[in-house]
């Protein structure tokens, strides 16, 4: 029986054996069906290759002779062509006979001398017939018949005889003989007796064979016989339908159908007739290299080891001497291009998951080119889906065989992955697509180019790769646990965790794909209920906020949207994916709906609803051409169009214009729409905002097929919660008359609701009713009576208002009808623009040509204003220059007429030394005594330097006359306001500038040299004058002349080199000068975005004018027609800049294997004392704000600026105007992305001053650890804040700081200390306060009023508090404290104490004192903390006496060390702090927790509860 179509039969399934009885079965009904035709099996191919390896001409010819039954031997030249054909015609019986015969000649094909899988020949199934392959070209004849050989006796030289029955072939050639037989000499008869006679005749003939060959090649029966219908069938297959050469499956099926139709006509049974599949390799072996590869694959399959090596292969087949030659031949032929044929070969083995090809790749992989491995993997990628042991073995073999292939597959560059995916080549897409974890682990490597996390997780969610997600999350958690167990801080980075992503961000990507399976896994690991921010725009997931319908609230809401949009645009320009929680957008992909999404979306949305997470309707801008409604988009057939990894939209962060709700309506899926409406309405959303921009939707859903969706949209099953019911849910229908009419028909009750007119106007403009600002104001006067009112009752229903806004002719009538309304207030153009800007100016996707032109005109107006100011300055300079020339000409005339009568003018010039003129150059020399010279006409150029006359002998300088007629004192013109530095400093020898003389006589000491000068000067005068002038020019003048813009008291330049910050809405920060002398940062803000900004700035200026040096000062403000300018303190950077620079330097040093000693933060901090002062700068700044009733609400390292090597606080808030630099002042809702906001901010609860305390605690940790965060890495930071799980291990060496910070960052805001209490913490105690605390503690211990109880004494000796009487706790002192302190010191402290009290030391006892003979003796209980405190206090108080006693005592080994620590009280305290480091903090914590108000009196201001 032939193999089934499309599958390859294993070798043992092809070994058919017929006995004599079976030969006669099924002979009725048109002939015998026992004529079994064999296909090209592995057995025959193995034999073929072994025959070739023998290189024995006689054997090869015998094989051909056996196959054809020809009397003559073929020529050797025909062997290469005929070998493939003869094996196709060789039955398995003949294969066995040939092996037995050759074994008798001591020629072996196998090492074990047997072909084991041929020994057990299964019984054949003779119900089907398969056509034989075509005969060789040389033997094709016009007639061919097939008959059956019954029994043949095989005889060998060893006496081996066997009776084997099988079918062979007989070919008839009309040109040579009538009939030629293949393996028999007679035809089969219908009875067994005839068959036996024929067998006997065959045996007799075989005995006469010269070669002792078991077959007689001569056909002694020459008689012709009639051709049966079965033979006619075979003849058609062989000559008319050569299926062996047909590779097209369609053509093959057509031919098969034609054959069956012919057989029906001839009344031949066709139920059991089938045509065997086309052989993989053409029967004629024209491609020798492919034949070798196929043979090697089969030979490799005979070995058991899957990871087969070439050495093992050669050793196994070592008897075949020529095998190495064929291996080398195979290696040389690999350079030929036969990839198509290789793919055909691979398409046979790989779909069957045959281990032969795995063994072949492992064995010969080093010889195979990467293109061949790519061909194998191409078939693997197309045919294999789910992983198993075979697929893993195949991938391991392919990756290990060729480095180039491995590099291509394991490279995670998105462009390369896209390219391979487009070509259907194997890549990491295969394990992701079919969720194969083991395969993913093999391919993914952190050492290679890492995947962009957003792109990777997008693919994971798209294909619902659950197993891979579970593996990555578990692996990440395991790594973190391992880091914690090893005592390290878990610090993820791209090299360690390249696929790490914030859980909230991953949930957003899930929402983009409606991947409920991945979202369910996330919910198992993370609790999003408490960690979800208020406006988390996933696609977007968010919690609703209360929005009232007042004018102020609406304006604020729209302004927030504008800021959000501007921020997205800025991120888009910088190609940076925003990581902010409110406005995070990952992949702005097209919103598509297909059959897969149809199943996914309702489940995902219901999962979000059950988890109390509500969906925002914003998604990416969609396109109908990308919508595929076929489920096959997730199968292999559709490959490239949908994925689009390399699409530019992957990083596009533009604002959405098509909402999720609109796409669901267009998709018209009932289940998805119901789930979405349920989620939105439970979250407090209303449709008026969700669909306000959807003008195209209004047209789309008016069609009849959307009737059901509209009914669902307006049914009563999804009511709005009460606090949102004031907003009309149908405002978005304002622009569509058809939908309004439909609304009136199905839901008339909605007309009685109150209408928010501002929402309605926004909807009208968004729907395109007014496409430009001009058109809006053109119609405004007609409708202002309506548009100026906040709300309208049922009196003016929706349809009437629609009529008014759409039909101008009815406006006057309706206005007269409703004039009894209360008189409205008038909105000015600015307020109307706020509404207009929301729907036009800031929405690029719906902006019209008019609005774009208006924006362009605004920019041109600004440029023209700049040009106008520039021209004005030039004109002024030109006019001033003209006036100067006139004055100079007048001076020249006067000087010429009075030359002969001129007397020297005594001028006192100080000797230009470096002490007197700090700005002079080192090359300057003292001015020599002037010599009278001839006069030279000069052009006076103003120099802003005054030379002071200092000698009393010099006569008083007369006042400058009004007219330049006297030659005694030249007039100094006023410096032009806009004169440049070049005009002030350049002097030429021809026109030296005159000296400017101060008219006020001053007599300094010591007197400088006096220099007499006349109008006539020498040639040295210009040089001297120039030198003196240059040395006196202040640096400030140089700075002033760099700034070309003057606004009030501000001077600055808009050149890029002077820009130190940029923000949204065109906000810029420049470096400039205020009042011509003070450097400031000048912030330029648009008036249009906040008309009340000037008032807010005035408040901030008033606030910061108060005496506080720890906050940024708001110096002054100026404004022009377009901008407001705010002057701020100019700083040198921020704490974040300082830390980030260190991180960059460390990274570079690590990569270059260098030691980095240039730690900027460490150098900036310096000593511990300076660190305390820097921290106090921050605390004092926050304390000042809190005293003024201000909550900063956005403290982070970026807002801690550096000025004069001290910290000051910035970003005090300025009307949502955000700047991305150190000059950032915002009061918008904090993002929380960096982890500097407490849980109540993230959950949008009431914000108090404790918010700043939490942020300050995080900043202190950040400062003291060089940039680390108290809640760990960003991946878990949000979750740790919400679950109150700080990670303070990096600061565990400083327990006092840990205690303070842990209080400041407590989740419970009531547990956080105030700024006053922070400054009282032991962390800020100096030496005096520590001594004061010890004294107070000792006084408490001595209290006689019962304040110090035994219970309190027990508490201060235990680490933990115990509630029960019998419970025990770990003692604070691990051993007696005398073992911690030097014995010599203990002894002398005790002696000194008893000397002072008049007693002596008698050692330890259960009591603290003992009275003997009227004397009181003191001693210490070394297990008691209070005695340790008493010892410390006594040592501090009497350190000099104890030092003296020790110095007089016999010397000891550590005597000098003890003496050194007794030099001062501070050293004594340091000594005990080193021996018992946690004592003061321990007592502070115990007293603060357990002391009542009476006991706290001892501590005054040291402890405040």
UniProtKB/Swiss-Prot annotation:
InterPro entries per record: IRE1/2-like, KEN_dom, KEN_sf, Kinase-like_dom_sf, Prot_kinase_dom
Limits of the Protein kinase domain: 1054-1324
One Gene Ontology term from the biological process aspect of the record: IRE1-mediated unfolded protein response
GO CC annotation: IRE1-TRAF2-ASK1 complex
Keyword rRNA processing: no
Residues binding ATP, per UniProt: 1060-1068, 1083
Bias-annotated ranges (Low complexity): 139-158, 173-209, 548-561, 896-924, 944-954, 960-977
Family matches, as CDD domains: RNase_Ire1_like
Biased composition (Basic and acidic residues): 562-571, 862-882
The enzyme's E.C. designation: 2.7.11.1
One Pfam family per UniProt: Ribonuc_2-5A
Region described as Disordered: 1-30, 121-211, 548-571, 862-1013
Family of this protein: Belongs to the protein kinase superfamily. Ser/Thr protein kinase family.
Record protein name field: Probable serine/threonine-protein kinase irlD
């Amino acid at each position: 029986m032939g193999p089934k179509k499309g599958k390859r039969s294993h070798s043992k399934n092809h070994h058919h054996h017929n006995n004599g009885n079976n030969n006669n079965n099924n002979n009725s009904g048109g002939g015998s069906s026992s004529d079994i035709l064999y296909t090209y099996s592995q057995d025959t191919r193995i034999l073929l290759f072994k025959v070739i390896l023998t290189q024995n001409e006689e054997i090869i010819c015998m094989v051909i002779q056996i196959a054809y039954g020809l009397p003559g031997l073929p020529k050797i030249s025909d062997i290469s062509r005929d070998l493939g054909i003869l094996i196709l015609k060789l039955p398995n019986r003949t294969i066995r006979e040939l092996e037995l015969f050759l074994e008798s000649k001591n020629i072996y094909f196998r090492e074990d001398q047997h072909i084991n899988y041929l020994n057990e020949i299964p019984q054949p199934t003779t119900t089907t017939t398969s056509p034989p392959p075509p005969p060789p070209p040389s033997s094709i004849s016009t007639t061919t018949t097939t008959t059956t050989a019954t029994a043949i006796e095989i005889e060998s030289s060893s006496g081996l005889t066997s009776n084997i029955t099988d079918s062979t072939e007989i070919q008839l050639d009309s040109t040579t003989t009538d009939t030629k037989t293949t393996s028999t000499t007679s035809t089969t008869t219908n009875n067994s007796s005839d068959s036996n006679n024929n067998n006997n005749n065959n045996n007799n003939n075989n005995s006469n064979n010269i070669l002792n060959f078991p077959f007689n090649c001569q056909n002694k029966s020459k008689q012709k016989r009639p051709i049966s219908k079965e033979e006619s069938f075979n003849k058609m297959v062989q000559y008319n339908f050569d299926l062996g050469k047909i590779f097209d499956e369609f053509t093959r099926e057509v031919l098969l159908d034609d054959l069956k139709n012919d057989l029906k006509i001839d009344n031949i049974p066709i139920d059991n007739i089938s045509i065997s599949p086309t052989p993989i390799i053409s029967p004629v072996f024209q491609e020798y290299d492919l034949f070798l590869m196929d043979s090697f694959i089969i030979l490799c399959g005979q070995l058991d080891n899957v990871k087969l090596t070439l050495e093992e292969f050669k050793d196994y087949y070592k008897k075949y001497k020529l095998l190495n030659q064929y291996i080398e031949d195979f290696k040389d032929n690999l350079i030929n291009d036969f990839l198509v044929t290789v793919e055909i070969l691979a398409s046979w083995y790989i779909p069957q998951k045959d281990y032969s090809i795995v063994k072949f790749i492992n064995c010969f992989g080093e010889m195979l080119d990467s293109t061949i491995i790519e061909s194998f993997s191409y078939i693997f990628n197309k045919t294999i889906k789910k992983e198993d042991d075979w697929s893993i073995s195949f991938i391991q073999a392919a990756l290990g065989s060729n480095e180039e292939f491995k590099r291509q597959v394991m490279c995670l560059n998105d462009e390369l992955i896209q390219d391979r995916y487009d070509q259907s080549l194997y890549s990491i897409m295969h394990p992701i697509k079919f969720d194969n974890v083991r395969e993913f682990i093999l391919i993914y490597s952190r050492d290679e180019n890492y995947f962009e996390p957003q792109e990777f997780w997008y693919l994971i969610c798209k294909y619902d790769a659950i197993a891979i997600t579970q593996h990555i999350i578990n692996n990440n958690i395991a790594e973190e646990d391992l880091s914690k167990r090893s005592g390290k801080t878990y610090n993820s980075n791209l090299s360690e965790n390249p696929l790490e992503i914030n859980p909230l961000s991953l949930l957003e990507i899930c929402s983009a794909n409606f991947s409920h399976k991945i979202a369910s896994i996330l919910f198992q690991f993370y609790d999003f209920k408490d960690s979800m921010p208020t406006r988390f725009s996933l696609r977007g997931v968010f919690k609703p906020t209360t929005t009232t319908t007042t004018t102020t609230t609406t304006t604020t809401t729209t302004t927030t949207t504008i800021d959000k949009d501007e921020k997205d645009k800025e991120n888009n320009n910088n190609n940076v994916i925003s990581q902010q929680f409110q406005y995070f957008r990952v992949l702005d992909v097209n919103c598509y709906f297909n059959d897969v999404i149809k199943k996914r979306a309702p489940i995902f949305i219901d999962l979000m609803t059950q988890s109390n997470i509500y969906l925002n309707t914003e998604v990416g801008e969609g396109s109908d051409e990308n919508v595929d409604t076929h489920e096959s988009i997730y199968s292999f057939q559709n490959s490239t169009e949908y994925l689009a990894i390399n699409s530019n939209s992957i990083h596009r962060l533009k604002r959405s214009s098509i909402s999720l709700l609109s796409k669901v309506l267009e998709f018209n899926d009932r289940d998805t729409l119901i789930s979405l409406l349920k989620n939105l309405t439970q979250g407090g959303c209303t449709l008026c905002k969700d669909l306000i921009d959807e003008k195209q939707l209004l047209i789309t859903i008016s069609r009849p097929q959307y009737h059901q969706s509209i009914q669902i949209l307006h049914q009563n099953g999804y009511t709005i919660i009460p606090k949102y019911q004031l907003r009309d849910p149908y405002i978005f229908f304002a622009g569509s008359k058809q939908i309004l009419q439909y609304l009136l028909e199905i839901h008339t009750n909605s007309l009685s609701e109150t209408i928010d007119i501002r929402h309605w106007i926004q909807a009208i403009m968004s729907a395109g009713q007014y496409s430009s600002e001009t058109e809006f104001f053109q119609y405004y006067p007609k409708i202002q009576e309506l548009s100026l009112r906040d709300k309208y009752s049922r009196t003016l229903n929706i349809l009437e208002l629609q009529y008014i806004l759409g039909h101008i002719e009815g406006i006057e009538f309706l206005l007269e009808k409703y004039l009894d309304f209360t008189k409205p207030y008038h909105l000015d153009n600015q307020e109307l623009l706020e509404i207009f800007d929301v729907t036009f100016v800031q929405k690029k996707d719906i902006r019209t040509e008019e609005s774009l032109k208006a924006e362009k005109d605004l920019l041109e107006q600004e440029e023209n204003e700049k040009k106008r100011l520039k021209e004005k300055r030039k004109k002024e300079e030109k006019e001033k220059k003209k006036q100067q020339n006139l004055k100079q000409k007048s001076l020249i005339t006067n000087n010429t007429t009075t030359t002969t009568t001129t007397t020297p003018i005594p001028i006192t010039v100080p000797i230009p030394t470096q002490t007197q003129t700090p700005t002079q150059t080192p090359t300057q020399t003292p001015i020599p005594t002037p010599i009278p010279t001839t006069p030279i006409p000069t052009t006076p150029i103003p120099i802003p330097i005054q030379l002071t006359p200092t000698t009393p002998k010099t006569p008083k300088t007369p006042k400058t006359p009004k007219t330049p007629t006297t030659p005694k004192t030249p007039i100094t013109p006023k410096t032009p306001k806009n004169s440049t530095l070049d005009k002030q400093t350049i002097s030429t020898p021809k026109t030296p500038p005159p000296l400017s003389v101060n008219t006020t006589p001053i007599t300094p000491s010591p007197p400088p040299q006096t220099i007499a000068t006349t109008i006539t000067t020498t040639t040295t005068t210009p040089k001297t004058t120039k030198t003196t002038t240059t040395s006196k020019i202040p640096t400030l003048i140089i700075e002033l002349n760099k700034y070309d813009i003057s606004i009030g008291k501000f001077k600055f330049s808009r050149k890029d080199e002077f820009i130190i910050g940029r923000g949204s809405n065109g906000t810029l920060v420049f470096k400039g000068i205020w009042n011509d002398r003070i450097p400031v940062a000048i912030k330029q803000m648009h008036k249009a975005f906040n008309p009340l900004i000037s008032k807010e700035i005035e408040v901030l200026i008033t606030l910061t004018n108060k005496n506080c040096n720890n906050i940024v000062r708001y110096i002054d403000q100026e404004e022009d027609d377009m901008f407001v300018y705010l002057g701020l303190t100019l700083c040198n950077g921020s704490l974040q800049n300082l830390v980030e620079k260190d991180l960059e330097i460390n990274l570079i040093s690590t990569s270059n294997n260098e030691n980095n000693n240039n730690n900027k933060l460490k150098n900036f901090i310096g000593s511990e004392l300076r660190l305390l002062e820097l921290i106090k700068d921050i605390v004092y700044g926050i304390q000042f704000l809190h005293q003024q009733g201000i909550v900063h609400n956005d403290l982070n390292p970026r807002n801690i600026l550096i000025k004069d090597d001290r910290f000051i606080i910035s970003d005090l808030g300025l009307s949502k105007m955000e700047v991305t630099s150190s000059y950032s002042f915002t009061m918008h809702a904090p993002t929380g992305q960096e982890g500097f906001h407490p849980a109540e901010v993230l959950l949008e609860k009431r914000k108090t001053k404790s918010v700043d305390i939490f942020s300050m605690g995080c900043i202190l940790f950040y400062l003291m650890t060089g940039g680390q965060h108290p809640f760990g890495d960003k991946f878990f930071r949000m979750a740790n804040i919400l679950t109150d799980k700080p990670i303070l291990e990096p600061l565990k060496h400083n327990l006092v700081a840990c205690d303070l910070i842990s209080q400041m960052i407590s989740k419970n805001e009531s547990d956080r200390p105030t700024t006053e209490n922070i400054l009282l913490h032991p962390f800020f105690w100096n030496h005096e306060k520590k001594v004061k605390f010890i004294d107070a503690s000792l006084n408490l211990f001595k209290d006689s009023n019962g304040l110090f109880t035994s219970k309190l004494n027990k508490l201060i000796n235990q680490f933990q508090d115990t509630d029960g009487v019998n419970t025990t706790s770990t003692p604070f002192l691990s051993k007696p404290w005398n073992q911690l302190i030097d014995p010599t010191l203990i002894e002398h402290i005790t002696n000194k104490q008893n000397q002072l009290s008049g007693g002596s030391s008698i050692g330890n006892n259960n009591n603290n004192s003992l009275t003997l003979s009227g004397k009181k003796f003191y001693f210490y209980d070394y297990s008691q903390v209070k005695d340790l405190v008493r010892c410390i206090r006594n040592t501090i108080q009497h350190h000099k006496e104890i030092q003296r006693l020790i110095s007089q005592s016999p010397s000891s080994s550590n005597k000098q060390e003890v003496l050194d620590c007794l030099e001062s009280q501070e050293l004594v305290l340091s000594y005990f702090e080193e021996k018992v480091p946690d004592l003061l903090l321990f007592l502070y914590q115990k007293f603060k927790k357990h002391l009542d108000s009476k006991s706290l009196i001892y501590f005054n201001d040291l402890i405040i509860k």
